[in-house]
């Protein structure tokens, strides 16, 4: 499998006019806790049901034999709303990143991409993401 797009949580700090999903919006108080708790409850089951290997075969461009293939590492794109919002980042994103690395460590590896608006990025968050092996 070359890639999977996984929406972690509906919460987003913005209300973009171009957004295709009405559930990507700001949530507050009890609503925020409910959408975060739902994502927190669901992610272990979602990860457990992902393919055992996230690899795919691609033709070897350096070979003249049509049956020569290279095994390549697939990727999972984590998105939301915005996965860098609080409390999504700490309660869902970071545990999901760690669980994905654990699941695929000995099964061909994984490239993990974090999709975000980017306006919540700080040097500290960038370091935290890189320490959890996001693909950059």
PLM features: residue spans?
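Active-site beta-loop-alpha junctions enriched in small/polar residues
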Residues: 81-83, 117-119
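Conserved, mostly hydrophobic/aromatic
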Residues: 114
